[in-house]
C-alpha cells in the first residue's frame, strides 16, 4: 500500500461519494451520538465559511428530526468575531441558511487583547501574530465549551480530510470538539453536500480562509499552505498529482501527526 493509499484509509476518504447519501449518514451520526450521550443538543461556531455552514446545517437537520421523533434537543449557532469581521455578510447568509434554533454572538476581542497585553507585561515580549491567531482559535473553543457545559450541549468540530491531512487547524482550538460530522470529506465533496442542501453558491465558492492573522487579514488558506485545495482533494481522492505536491502533502501529514492523536504518553508508539 502506498503512503497515499495509507493516508486515504486513515482519513476515511472515499474517491467518489453520493452527496444525498452522505448527508443522510452524517445526520444519522449526529442523531445517534447525541442520543447515546444523553446530551441536550449541539453548539457550533459559525464563521460564514463552507465548513461551519455545512456542519451547522447538518446539526440543525439532526435536532429537528429528533424533535419530530419525540426528543428534546436544540442547536445553538455561535458567531465569534474578533472585532468586525470583513465577511460578516457571509456569516449572516450562513446563519439564514442554517436556520439554527438559537444564534448568539460573542466578540472575542476584549478577551484576546486582555490576554495578549498581560502576556506582554509578564513575559516582556509580544505574542507573534501567529500565536495570537492561535489564542483567538482557542478562545473561540473556550466559548463554545462554556455554552456546551452550561447547557448540556456537545461541541461540533468542522475538521475534514483536506484539513486533517495537512494539520491545518489549531490544536485545542478549532481542533477541539466532541464530534466531527465532516470527517472523511474532501473540500470539493463538502461543497457538493452544500449544493445538494440548496445553499447559496456564495457559501461554498468563497475563498477559504482561517482569518486568524491581524497582519494578513483574510489570507487565503491556499497561500498559507502553499498547496491548493484542488491538489489536496485530488491527492486524497487517489488521483495523480505532481511529485513535488505529493511530497509537500506527505511532509505536512507526517509532521502534523500529533494533532490527530491524543496527547502522547510513554505507552504510545505513533510518535516514535
Swiss-Prot record:
It holds the Pfam family NAD_synthase. Deamido-NAD(+) binds at residues 138, 171, 178, 258-259. GO terms for biological process: NAD biosynthetic process. GO terms for molecular function: ATP binding; glutaminase activity; metal ion binding; NAD+ synthase (glutamine-hydrolyzing) activity; NAD+ synthase activity. Keywords: ATP-binding, Ligase, Magnesium, Metal-binding, NAD, Nucleotide-binding. NCBIfam families: nadE, PRK00768.1. It comes from Bacillus cereus (strain 03BB102). HAMAP family: NadE_ammonia_dep. ATP binds at residues 45-52, 158, 187, 209. It comes from the Bacteria. Its EC number is 6.3.1.5. It is an enzyme of class 6 (ligase). Belongs to the NAD synthetase family. This is NH(3)-dependent NAD(+) synthetase. GO terms for cellular component: cytoplasm.
Amino acid at each position: 500500500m502506498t503512503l497515499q493509499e495509507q493516508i486515504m484509509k486513515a482519513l476515511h476518504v472515499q474517491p467518489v461519494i453520493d452527496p444525498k447519501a452522505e448527508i443522510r449518514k452524517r445526520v444519522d451520526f449526529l442523531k445517534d451520538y447525541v442520543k447515546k450521550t444523553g446530551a441536550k443538543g449541539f453548539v457550533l461556531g459559525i464563521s460564514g465559511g463552507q465548513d461551519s455552514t455545512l456542519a451547522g446545517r447538518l446539526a440543525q437537520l439532526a435536532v429537528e428530526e429528533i424533535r419530530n421523533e419525540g426528543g428534546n434537543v436544540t442547536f445553538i449557532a455561535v458567531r465569534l468575531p474578533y472585532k468586525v469581521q470583513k465577511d460578516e455578510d457571509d456569516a449572516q447568509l450562513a446563519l439564514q441558511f442554517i436556520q439554527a434554533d438559537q444564534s448568539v454572538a460573542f466578540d472575542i476581542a476584549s478577551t484576546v487583547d486582555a490576554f495578549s497585553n498581560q502576556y506582554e507585561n509578564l513575559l516582556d515580549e509580544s505574542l507573534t501574530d501567529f500565536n495570537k491567531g492561535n489564542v483567538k482559535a482557542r478562545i473561540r473553543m473556550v466559548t463554545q465549551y462554556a455554552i456546551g457545559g452550561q447547557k448540556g450541549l456537545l461541541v461540533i468540530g468542522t475538521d475534514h480530510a483536506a484539513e486533517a491531512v495537512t494539520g491545518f487547524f489549531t490544536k485545542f482550538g478549532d481542533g477541539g470538539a466532541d464530534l466531527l460530522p465532516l470527517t472523511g470529506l474532501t473540500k470539493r465533496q463538502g461543497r457538493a453536500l452544500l449544493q445538494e442542501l440548496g445553499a447559496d453558491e456564495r457559501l461554498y465558492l468563497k475563498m477559504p480562509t482561517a482569518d486568524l492573522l491581524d497582519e494578513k487579514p483574510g489570507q487565503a488558506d491556499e497561500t498559507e499552505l502553499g498547496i491548493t485545495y484542488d491538489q489536496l482533494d485530488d491527492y486524497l481522492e487517489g488521483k495523480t498529482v505532481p511529485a513535488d505536491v505529493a511530497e509537500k502533502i506527505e511532509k505536512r501529514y507526517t509532521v502534523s501527526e500529533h494533532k490527530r492523536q491524543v496527547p502522547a504518553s510513554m505507552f504510545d508508539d505513533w510518535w516514535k
